[in-house]
Design a protein with these regions (language model features):
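Acidic helix/loop microenvironments that form the catalytic cleft of cell-wall polysaccharide enzymes
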Residues: 199
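Charged/polar low-complexity intrinsically disordered segments
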Residues: 56-58
Length: 289
């Protein structure tokens, strides 16, 4: 899964593909490099990012509208119209250039998910685990699309203050189980769900390493697994020198090592910014398995 950030402030590329034409070019390049799918996102969820979380009352008022209101969001969050303006032209252009391309939309907003799938996306990748927008589960059930449920603890602006967990894998496994069962009960087909343990999402540096090493414990939930370690902070911390984390743009080899562990533990999908390198790594890891 190749990453395409149509944002001005993502931690990994800092707006390199905020221009829509460049984003389309990059998506097509990743597909040409061998990506099975591209994940297109229009809002950063980097640490300290502000995001919109709707109450169920607000959703009840908005769910029948064509495009949900933006009055409840943080001033720093990306509005639905703005997010749609970023991603829809890219999705449409990729679909025109490569009609058979598999496209994922990276969003936690049900309104964006619906419009993106109507424009040609086949998968919704929700970093909130379908938790931030109460309309998301109903929307995904209606759309009958693929759904990536990501484990996240709290919101990005809360991560620094989260209480530590003695055994975070047990928490992640229990919550993923609860969230998937709720999603299935509310209408999402089991065979459309992929689970992501959410490396870096509400976990501190020390917690990410055992989560990845123990990834195989999630197989008991009986869903395909996605791993997204690409360029993340815990990679930079592992490669730190003289007290300074490795810069984002120089984390490739650490990323590949993390992805190799993920593959060895049974990951089905690798979400990456560096498709060619990750694909070579995956092929070699498969040969040695």
């Amino acid at each position: 899964m190749g990453v395409v950030n149509v944002t001005p402030d993502s931690f990994s590329d800092g707006g390199l593909y905020f221009d829509k034409d460049r984003a389309v070019e990059h998506a097509l390049e990743l597909l040409d490099q061998g990506a099975d799918m591209v994940d297109i996102g229009g809002e950063s969820t980097r640490p300290s990012a502000r995001v919109m979380v709707r109450s169920r009352t607000e959703v009840d008022e908005l769910v029948n509208s064509d495009l949900a209101s933006t009055t409840s969001m943080s001033r720093a969050a990306v509005s639905e119209p703005e997010e749609l303006d970023r991603v829809l032209p890219v999705i449409a252009a990729v679909r025109r250039a490569k009609p058979d391309a598999l496209i994922s939309i990276d969003t936690y907003k049900a309104g964006v998910a619906r419009k993106a799938v109507e424009a040609g996306a086949a998968i919704v990748n929700d970093v909130s685990g379908f938790r931030w927008d109460p309309a998301m589960i109903k929307t995904l059930a209606e759309l009958k699309c693929g759904a990536v449920l990501v484990h996240m603890r709290g919101r990005p602006d809360q991560w620094r203050n989260l209480k530590p967990q003695a055994d975070l894998m047990l928490v992640v496994k229990r919550e993923l189980s609860d969230w998937t069962e709720e999603s299935v009960r509310l209408g999402i087909k089991r065979d459309r769900i992929v689970l992501d343990p959410g490396l870096g999402f509400g976990k501190n540096f020390e917690q990410n390493y055992p989560l990845l090493k123990r990834l195989d414990e999630l197989h008991s939930l009986r869903f395909p697994l996605l791993v997204g370690a690409s360029r993340k902070s815990f990679v930079g911390r592992a490669l730190a020198k003289d007290g300074h984390d490795r810069p984002v743009g120089d984390r490739l080899f650490g990323t590949l090592a993390a992805e190799t562990v993920g593959i060895s533990k049974g990951a089905h999908i690798i979400r990456t910014h560096d498709v060619r390198a990750s694909l070579d790594t995956a092929r070699m890891a498969d040969q040695l398995a």
